[in-house]
From Swiss-Prot:
Major site of localization recorded for this protein: cytoplasm
Organism: Lactobacillus acidophilus (strain ATCC 700396 / NCK56 / N2 / NCFM)
Keyword NAD carried by entry: no
Subunit structure: Homodimer. Heterotetramer of two MnmE and two MnmG subunits.
PROSITE patterns, A to Z: G_TRME (PS51709)
Pfam family, one: MMR_HSR1
The name this protein goes by in its record: tRNA modification GTPase MnmE
SUPFAM superfamilies per the UniProt record, alphabetical: P-loop containing nucleoside triphosphate hydrolases
Keyword terms: Cytoplasm, GTP-binding, Hydrolase, Magnesium, Metal-binding, Nucleotide-binding, Potassium, tRNA processing
Annotated localization: Cytoplasm
Length: 461
């Protein structure tokens, strides 16, 4: 881990969402955090209070002597804080004006506006957390289901860090033997160390493969399963969206073409996070505005992981229905025969025989058979996923790409040993894999990558 750094200036930011609310929090971190807070706080002498204590008082503008707000101020002294620096958190009444006024007061008295993710970056640089734990901070904030939260918490507690470090140590132990052989060639242990490298490479590859098997589930838990609701106009798409979200996000009428754009919403169905996309009806139209909606719907369909295709069961299949069936044939999909209460011209058995897909019959407005739909969504989500109930998962593309790179480097080591290439040459890829795994945790990550990663965080984190 990195050594604790003390040359940072003092930063400040609003840590709660901007807007009206009961409480807002303005956070400072740095060597002068307590001193600056003391200059604007009327109550206890913050310079003298014990660490990890909270104090009632008022925020005062020293220039005017006027009270800005009453507040509760928390004092946390280094090094036992999130950033390993002195931290002060000012709890004030929620609202844009009062919160921003307090922030500006802190900036005026010597703090600097924090960059996005800078609090978490300081925690990383000061050795409090590694990169996987830093990423988990935002995963907890953005978690869409309880399962996603559990995985993020496990990562914050060092679950993935432990697995990566175990693999790196395995490589390092073998590298030590290789270095001895290179430095003392008279012992003629070249074959032994080459075989050790190959065996270690195989062992680490097995561990990498186990992590990579979690990548698909981890990605979906983090980002949601992009789910397009498609069908002809007035087939019940908006009714389905409203049912799944338990709200009236979409307008439901008997007028075709009511939805002229894509509507998006995140929901949890049986623990599966869905990014629902209610599309405009995909059909031929001469209406210019409706055409735009249809084009956006087609793009939404292209990126969808799952398609919920609605067909009016009370009517014979139309040419447009058949076209949609063909267009979605390559996707994971569930075909929903809606309006079954109006009489069925198409049966579940007929549709299954025609498409080979999962099919249910329902009346969405009457909520008939909707439990079966939710079960099917869960079933399709886990199809092809090795679900071990392990809380340690690979949750983003950065981690996945680096694991693939490390695996490739280790495969090159095995090939080099098989080809009889000298140990000191094969060692290059072996060391490369050790470095690549270190990029996942940040122990060997370039500064540019670290800066780019933390820039994706929001202010105050």
């Amino acid at each position: 881990m990195a050594q604790v750094l003390t040359e940072f200036d003092t930063i400040a930011a609003i840590s709660t969402p901007i807007g009206e609310g009961g409480i807002s929090i303005v956070r400072m971190s740095g060597e002068d955090a307590i001193k600056i807070a003391n200059e604007v706080f009327k109550g206890a002498d913050l310079a003298q209070v014990p660490t990890h204590t909270i104090h009632y008082g008022h925020i005062i503008d020293p220039d005017t002597g006027k009270t800005i707000d009453e507040s509760m101020v928390t004092v946390l002294r280094a090094p036992k804080t999130f950033t390993c620096e002195d931290i002060v958190e000012i709890n004030c009444h929620g609202g844009i004006v009062v919160t921003n006024h307090i922030l500006q007061l802190l900036l005026k008295h010597g703090a600097r506006m924090a960059d996005p993710g800078e609090f978490t970056k300081r925690a990383f640089v000061n050795g409090r957390i590694d990169l996987t734990q830093a990423e988990s901070v935002m995963d907890i904030v953005r978690a869409k289901t309880d399962k996603a939260r559990q995985v993020a918490v496990s990562q914050l507690e060092g679950g993935l860090l432990h697995k990566i470090r175990t693999m790196r140590q395995e490589i390092l132990d073998t590298l030590a033997n290789v270095e001895v052989n290179i430095d003392y060639p008279e012992y003629d242990a070249d074959t032994v160390t080459a075989n050790q490298m190959a065996d270690t490479a195989k062992s680490v590859i097995e561990k990498i493969d186990r992590l990579l098997k979690t990548a698909q589930e981890g990605k979906i838990l983090r980002n949601g399963l992009a789910t397009a609701i498609v069908g002809q106009p007035n087939v019940g798409k908006s009714s389905l969206l409203n049912y799944l979200t338990q709200s009236d996000k979409a307008i439901v009428t008997d007028v075709a073409g009511t939805t002229r754009d894509t509507l998006e919403e995140y929901v949890s169905v049986k623990g599966v996070p869905l990014e629902l996309i209610d599309t405009a009806g995909i059909h031929h139209t001469d209406d210019k505005v409706e055409k735009i909606g249809v084009e956006r719907s087609k793009k939404a369909l292209e990126r969808a992981d799952l398609v919920l295709l609605l067909i009016d069961a009370s009517k014979e299949l139309t040419a447009e229905d058949k076209s949609l069936i063909n267009e979605t044939d390559s996707k994971k999909r569930i075909i929903i025969l809606n309006k079954s209460d109006l009489g069925q011209k198409i049966t579940v058995e007929q549709m299954k025989k025609l498409t080979g897909s999962e099919v249910i019959s329902t009346s969405i407005l009457k909520e008939d058979n909707m439990d079966e739909l939710e079960e099917l969504i869960n079933k399709l989500f886990f199809a092809g996923i090795e679900n071990s109930n392990d809380q340690v998962m690979v949750t983003n593309q950065r981690q996945t790409s680096l694991l693939h790179k490390a695996k490739s480097e280790l495969e090159d080591v095995i090939q080099a040993v098989d080809d009889g290439i000298p140990v000191d040459i094969a060692q290059i890829d072996f060391t490369g894999a050790w470095d690549t795994l270190g990029e996942i945790t940040g122990e060997s990550a370039p500064d540019e990558l670290i800066t780019q990663l933390f820039s994706q965080f929001c202010l105050g984190k």
